[in-house]
Amino acid sequence: MIKKFCKKYKLPENTLHELLSHMAEVRFSKGELIISEGERNSNFYLLKKGIWRAYYLTDGTENSLWFAAPGDTAFSSWGYVDSEVSLINIESVNESIAYCISKPELEALFSHSIDMANFGRRIFEREILSVDSPQ
């Protein structure tokens, strides 16, 4: 998970270990919602174990948007960027473990380390690429 994450986001391992030292390990059960539609959640997650899925409901039908695997990040774009309620659900597909940090704590790290600030920029660059990628 560490090597995958560092390669994907071009982050030195020592910087990732610094980030992890500020994050809390959290566990989720199969089917548990990490973020619910209509909820405000500005936390930032790094998936250690398990699979997560983001989806929204249309007329009772679940429409999947993306899946996250170990080494991937996950967060509510609306909650993180604008402190708005989420328009999607993020669910743990199976038993999962993630690292979690609040937006204010993460932004404090960004302001104290150029490696962390660059990491933050790359996260959002990856988000833009995922939105623009043809399916």
Name what the model sees in each region.
Residues 1-135:
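Cytosolic regulatory regions built on CNB/CRP/Popeye-like sensor folds
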